[in-house]
């Protein structure tokens, strides 16, 4: 009888866990739709800015080198200092979501160590901060409650400090790493080499003439657009990471719910078997007692 009570207690416990994981799955599904929409919109806007930047950069570069006009285009032959901005979740229960990002950061740290590049980390998200603190790896800047609730102002504040350091020569390169949303069931690591700007001009190299007519202060226009470009790239990394996080958590909770269902089924079979054995034992004892009284 005590065995039956123990199995019944386990069934109740696993069933409660199943209800919890299923509820978390539904919450993540609802949040995913909102985060996915925000990621799509920010990506489209960033792409449009990229197109305009390509056009303006090409026009300016026809007359003078961009390296001399804007610090964002200055590229050193030998990179000595680099800043890595990486995004992880503030919460857990999302499968290998955070592990993939941390692995990508570690791989880049190892590569920089081999090349003797000094790296500074700017960490967004509690999970990544706790991991590198545990590893005794110094973190230059730590941002909590940002990856779980990203907004444009937060993104601007984060990237502005890094960009200022690049302009002032404190760092030679800025890279953003995050685990991005691919679809409902998968995510992918995205590494964005934000500074120095290299890709913008090359996209327009094939054009024979610019379609845009600018005022004399075209460098100022490009400078302002570049700042917006950096800000939206940072913002996209935050919202894209959040969408991927909800996707990973939804998948993890779905797997946990299915595992709980399977466990309840196993425990029910064990309960029925134990109950049948208990009844059989009782019947044998009754029959034996009756036989002994004859």
UniProtKB/Swiss-Prot annotation:
Entry keywords, A to Z: ATP synthesis, Cell inner membrane, Cell membrane, CF(1), Hydrogen ion transport, Ion transport, Membrane, Transport
Protein name as catalogued: ATP synthase gamma chain
GO molecular function: ATP binding; proton-transporting ATP synthase activity, rotational mechanism
NCBIfam families: ATPsyn_F1gamma
Species assigned in the record: Campylobacter lari (strain RM2100 / D67 / ATCC BAA-1060)
Subunit (UniProt): F-type ATPases have 2 components, CF(1) - the catalytic core - and CF(0) - the membrane proton channel. CF(1) has five subunits: alpha(3), beta(3), gamma(1), delta(1), epsilon(1). CF(0) has three main subunits: a, b and c.
Disulfide bond entries: none
Pfam families, per database record: ATP-synt
BP terms from Gene Ontology: proton motive force-driven plasma membrane ATP synthesis
An annotated GO cellular component: proton-transporting ATP synthase complex
SUPFAM superfamilies registered for this protein in UniProt: ATP synthase (F1-ATPase), gamma subunit
Domain of life: Bacteria
Family, as annotated: Belongs to the ATPase gamma chain family.
Location relative to the cell: Cell inner membrane
Membrane topology term: Peripheral membrane protein
Biological role: Produces ATP from ADP in the presence of a proton gradient across the membrane. The gamma chain is believed to be important in regulating ATPase activity and the flow of protons through the CF(0) complex.
